[in-house]
UniProtKB/Swiss-Prot annotation:
The modification Phosphoserine is found at S294. Transmembrane segments: none annotated. Residues 83-98 have a biased composition (Polar residues). Residues 31-53 have a biased composition (Low complexity). May play a role in vesicle trafficking. Residues 1-10, 249-263 have a biased composition (Basic and acidic residues). It comes from Arabidopsis thaliana (Mouse-ear cress). The gene is PVA42. Belongs to the VAMP-associated protein (VAP) (TC 9.B.17) family. This is Vesicle-associated protein 4-2. The keyword Phosphoprotein applies. SUPFAM superfamilies: PapD-like. GO terms for cellular component: endoplasmic reticulum membrane.
């Protein structure tokens, strides 16, 4: 048997064109005809199978599109959460937003208001003073905090003030000797003090645990910077510091004195005591007179 060589087609392509199977049909009729010609099943079964395949493909595409649309609805087309099906998050109220921009209302009035002045005496413990007044309509607890608790302490470290009450607190600080020809002004920002306040229900004993138990209601009143003053040079800040320290010392001495006794001495500005003394003197004089007569 003689083998003949296959001639190329007129379009210049090889003979593999006869075996080419199109992956995508150009029309529905050609798809139906090809299915009917190549399918081993009857034409009715082929149509049913094709229809079922198209239905499943359409259902899968619809589910995928619905799932994708749901994701877009939750995250938004740009992933920014702007979709229609996104659950609305509770937006803050206008009052809360406005309150966040308002400055915190002060409960205490401080004098000095922003700085603590100390005489600069290296190697010694020096003092400063600050006047604290409760300007609110309720009882307020306050306490000191410092960035250098080892070298600074306050007296009192905290207290509870009634409405309108004023106290002068004394602040003690050890002044470190200068290093490398350091100037006093170079130390003004190293140590800071912070005064915290807390509204309380009424008069009570001060305990530091109040600020831990009600930390959500604690307010920061002021952060005070340390300023050193030359004790050899007179200036208004130094003179004011001396006056406040004298007031603080007088208040401490007044608290040390025992309370006056409440008794007969308080009745009639001492009339009871004076009458008792007169009676005793008359009694002693009478006893002396009787003794002289007996002799």
């Amino acid at each position: 048997m003689t083998m003949t060589e296959e001639k190329p087609t007129s379009d210049g392509k090889g003979g593999w064109g006869f075996f080419k199977i199109p992956f995508r049909n150009s029309s529905g009729h050609r798809n139906a005809a090809s299915s009917a010609a190549t399918s081993p099943f009857p034409s009715g079964a082929s149509s049913s199978s094709t229809s079922s395949h198209l239905h499943n493909h359409h259902q899968h595409h619809h589910q995928h599109h619905h799932q994708h649309h749901h994701q877009l609805g939750y995250n938004g087309p740009h992933g920014d959460g702007s979709g229609q099906n996104q659950h609305p998050t509770p937006s803050p109220s206008v009052s809360s937003v406005a309150k966040s921009f308002l400055p915190t209302k002060r409960r205490l009035k401080l004098d000095p208001s922003e700085k603590l002045y100390f005489p600069y005496e290296p190697g010694k413990q020096v003092r400063s003073a600050i006047k604290i007044k409760n300007t609110s309509k309720s009882h307020v607890a306050f306490k000191f905090q410092t960035t250098a608790p080892k070298s600074c302490f306050m007296r009192p470290p905290g207290a509870i003030l009634a409405p309108g009450e004023t106290i002068i607190a004394t602040v003690f600080k050890f002044v470190e000797p200068p290093e490398n020809n350091e100037k006093p002004m170079d130390q003004r920002s190293r140590v800071k003090f912070k005064i915290m306040s807390l509204k309380v229900k009424g008069p009570m004993d001060y305990v530091p645990e109040l600020f831990d138990e009600q930390k959500d209601d604690v307010s920061k009143e002021q952060i005070l910077r340390v300023i050193f003053l030359d004790p050899e040079r007179s200036n208004p800040a130094l003179e004011k510091l001396k006056r406040q320290l004298a007031e603080a010392d007088a208040a401490v001495e007044a608290r040390k004195k025992p309370p006056e006794e409440t008794g007969p001495k308080m009745i009639g500005e001492g009339l009871v005591i004076d009458e008792w003394k007169e009676r005793r003197e008359r009694y002693l004089a009478q006893q002396q007179g009787e003794g002289a007569d007996s002799v």
